[in-house]
Amino acid sequence: MNTDLRMPMGEGGLSRRRFALALPLLGACALVAPGDVLASADPRVQRASRVLMGTRVDLVTAATDARDARALQVAMQAAFTEMARLEALMSRYRSDSEVSRIGAASGLRPVPVSPEVMAVLRQAQRLHRGSAGAFDPTIGTLRGWHFEPGQEAAPSPAEITQGLRLVDARALVLDDAAGTAYLTQRGMALDLGGVAKLPILQAGLQVLERAGVAHALVNGGGDVLVLGSLQGRPWRVGVRDPAAPAQLMGVLELEGRGVVASSGDYERGFVRAGRRLHHI
């Protein structure tokens, strides 16, 4: 399950991870897709959206008193600011990010990293071990795929073979005491698109909590986190049928704390030589 951390608009605009696209059902029956921003008739419910990590991130917050509307807006802005800060640290599309600096120094020297990046790198290592190597954060050299309409492209077998020589998570050395990360082979590069989104969204939700928001939903391109409820009712997350995107496979009701994560190939992909290629 991969997502682009700050994909440039020229490389496909807004990208989203979707197997079954998780959509919040806000209100009694209203289906609100990620990317839709609705003006709320009830000032106790505030909504806002930003483009982050190459996708649309939606925040919904709720309060019991309409007089709290301004406080909700301020809290949401702070949450977006924190998520943007973390994205800037982990994006492979920014030359000044910590992830890019690690790649630039590969085979040369360890690079100091922030605690937030260190935590995500540690999680990436755990996922690598737990998946018997199927998940690998060092795939940054494999950049030849483009799945957006009109920009479809795939690397040649020779390019893939060459890139795979520089993919090996065991070459990622983390030093907690020194606070550094090091790729031991020159030319290696990181891609945290498959692991960084959820921690970034969680950080946004934590900002809301620290601001006193008790009821919130964070939706980032198929990853949905909820806190509390929506005016006394559970948050409702619809799951689309990948074979019939206009239809829902079902609806999940979440209350208190909950997470729904989904990803898939039915939108971002193309067929070449009889084979479907996609972003996962």
Language-model segments: what does each one mean?
Residues 2-280:
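Mature catalytic core of soluble alpha/beta enzymes
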